[in-house]
Amino acid sequence: MYILVWKRGQQIKTFHTLDEAANFKAASNIDEAQMFSITVAPAISASGGSNEATNLRRLMYLSKSTNPEECNPQFLAEMARVATLRNREIGVSGFLMYSSPFFFQVIEGTDEDLDFLFAKISADPRHERCIVLANGPCTGRMYGDWHMKDSHIDSITTHPAMKTILYQIARSFSSMWSYLPKSAGNMLLLGKDPAAQPPEPMSVVVTFIYLVEFGSILSNPNLTEQAAEVLSTFVDVCVKNVEGSGGNIAKFITGICMAYWPINRTEDALNAIQQISEDLAQLRSQQAPGSAISLMYSQAGVHYGRAMLCNAGSRKSDFTLLGDCINTTSRIATLAKKLKTPLLFSFEVRCLLGDEMREEVEGAGMHQVKGRDKPVVVYQFPGPELDVEMVRQKIEHFTPGRFRCQMPVVEYESLPISQRPPIFDDTPKGKPRPRTPGYGGRQRSDSLVDRLIMIAKLAGPSISATGDSTLTTLTYISQATRPMSRLDLSAIMRTATRRNAQLSITGTLLYVNGLFVQTLEGPKDAMVNLYLKIRQDPRHTDVVTVHMAPIQERAYPAEWTLTSATEEMLATFPPLQDVLSQLAKSFTSLETYVPSTVVRYLTAGNNPRNLMPVSCGVVMLATDICSFTSLTEKSSLTEVWMICNTFIDACTSAICQEGGEVIKLIGDCVTAYFPGNGADSAVAAAQELFTFCRQLREAFVDVLDVRGCVSCGVGLDYGQVVMAQCGSLGLTEYVVAGAVSARVMEVESITREVGYAIVITEPVADRLSPQLRDHGIIPTPQAIEGLPCYGIAGEEFELDVDSIKRGIKALHAARSGEKPLALEPEEAKQDYRVSPGRMRHGDSGRRSNSAQGKRSTQVR
């Protein structure tokens, strides 16, 4: 073991290897520090012997067999025999269970023994996709007598529930793994829950890599069919070079790759970004005539600073980097477009380069960027310019001819209903959903519940006579709100048996360590109605659907009706409860990071790899925190995380409650989409979000807290998007991309100029209900790409950016002990000025006429 000591002995951190200590020292930019090598002797128990339990660790993993056909009981018995002989020699105990096609294994022993053994296990060609479910210290051996005992599922139990449930949870878990953010995946590999990890400050080199003029590609109707293939190629090129140079992909954002490296990999980062440009150039030269890949160019900005690796959000989560340096990096990447350079980096990055590379760079001047008071000094490598205008001209004059891509995009409405991917929230809109006070409640949103509610409503009261009688199975997991006794379980069984016999529903219910796992099977509509009632039962929470699909025949005989399989089954194989419990917990955690469309498609019994690229019209929403850079530049990283977490939870709650789908969480920015006919719902979500921010400020009005200065602007626009999954090199992204994706960000940005918190474009206004369209919007003097814009009327939805900025300055001044700055005469006048585009109460106006000569209507 190695100890790193700095700050005159005030800061101490331990490491298992010397390399870990050195990397931490370099990444943390610690100059004056000393490293010591120490040996830890095992503790002595009260009986005078060595207490091995003080140095034990337990590791559980899931993997998939590469050849399930050969995994018969004899094959597994031989595997277990060899493992037992080997593991006894090194003092490792545990168990191995196989439920086709998945292996479940737990090993326990010392750190050194487990690291050695698991490295060999991971390299074994008999399995793949080795995913750690749990990994941590333990107080003693739980499986000391097992020693890798063969545990084929058929040898443990003939109960079909075990086989079905283990397969369904393991299959869903394994399929969702590739959609995880890399940082969250690394946490799970260490046996940690990403959502439970505290924020981790770090020094990083951050980049934003742009696919040049990707919006123009999406806007060109001749290239829409190839958009998914272009994105998939971009994802693969970025993943190969970033991860191959020691970096990490943070996220992909509609033709943008955000990545980061430790500071001792700065030169590797710049080389990787240059290699991405070279790889795209090589791909362009190899394409057949008509291929849109020949239009792919990259442009990047790089910056260095302190950031925080943390989990943001709860209902939908993102494990990402937060910090002021992220915003600055984005501004530098935008500046690269203006300076016509493929790679632009800041002075801070230049300082991290070695002498040899530093001599190659040349200055690109000092420039003022949005959100920063001081200008930034930037540098570039000498080389040919990248003229964005030239790329745009190539795209506009490009014709694909007879070229046909490998991933064609299909119009969503042209597909049969049964083949359409579940891209929308199908919750019926007949009755307004109740508004619940607060955000981020404990009850989770279920992956399939919205679709199930719709089915139940369509079924009506006479489901047994006229409803869908397709034989269907559904499996869900949930957490008990309190420990369940035998009497509690007996009461559940009596009620379930009586109720389900009338509906011809069979199944099984498992209760393991506070976890319910239930499988239901029966006529589809009857089962769906029953499931919706089960969800409301106060005896459990966090209800999540794992699997739902039609079946040919029942797995559970009618005479069982509903069978409780608890102690009888688990007594034959005690480790089974650990496997079930850990799988369920990991699945529940994983589901929040994966796009809702993928989760719904997967839990409906489909392979996510079969998701078809589609295009459709949607109402796009974009929102972010006003003056975020000013608010956070003098705040601690923990406060930045707190602000973003609070805001993201509010956004996801409002959006999901109104039937929208969250696309991306980008620091303080959230993007989402609603169905084309969901304009009113999108406006309602925006109003709910802005109201939350106002109530948050009021709650902290008398406290020096950064949350007392949080406000937001919301932009809404309508347009065509392409929805497709991209990537094949171990990282998969489900992308929602279109020209509207970039345009809605511009719509959101003008909220500060026109004085309205919510701004919509003409296409959205045309899709509003008559009442809201004719009496709830006010024209603004601003237009985006020729589209007139409107603000949502109402005094409660006015946005005073000057007041917000003064509040932020006053907060920072008060916290630093300074006197608040006096208002300049011009600023004082602005307090009484009506913001551009805002109408005084009592004034009347009319909606502006669009280019098509649309209606004009009286508004307040």
From Swiss-Prot:
Gene3D superfamilies: 3.30.70.100, Nucleotide cyclase. InterPro entries: A/G_cyclase (IPR001054), Acylphosphatase-like_dom_sf (IPR036046), Adenylyl/Guanylyl_Cyclase_3/4 (IPR050697), BLUF_domain (IPR007024), Nucleotide_cyclase (IPR029787). Residues 847-860 have a biased composition (Polar residues). It is an enzyme of class 4 (lyase). Keywords: ATP-binding, cAMP biosynthesis, Cell projection, Chromophore, Cilium, FAD, Flagellum, Flavoprotein, Lyase, Nucleotide-binding, Photoreceptor protein, Receptor, Repeat, Sensory transduction. Its EC number is 4.6.1.1. SUPFAM superfamilies: Acylphosphatase/BLUF domain-like, Nucleotide cyclase. Residues 56-149, 471-563 form the BLUF domain. It catalyses: ATP = 3',5'-cyclic AMP + diphosphate. Its cofactor is FAD. Residues 420-443, 819-860 are annotated as: Disordered. GO terms for biological process: cAMP biosynthetic process. It is found in: Cell projection, Cilium, Flagellum. Residues 205-333, 619-748 form the Guanylate cyclase domain. PANTHER family: ADENYLATE CYCLASE, TERMINAL-DIFFERENTIATION SPECIFIC, ADENYLATE CYCLASE, TERMINAL-DIFFERENTIATION SPECIFIC-RELATED. This is Photoactivated adenylate cyclase subunit beta. It comes from Euglena longa. The lineage of its organism: Eukaryota, Discoba, Euglenozoa, Euglenida, Spirocuta.
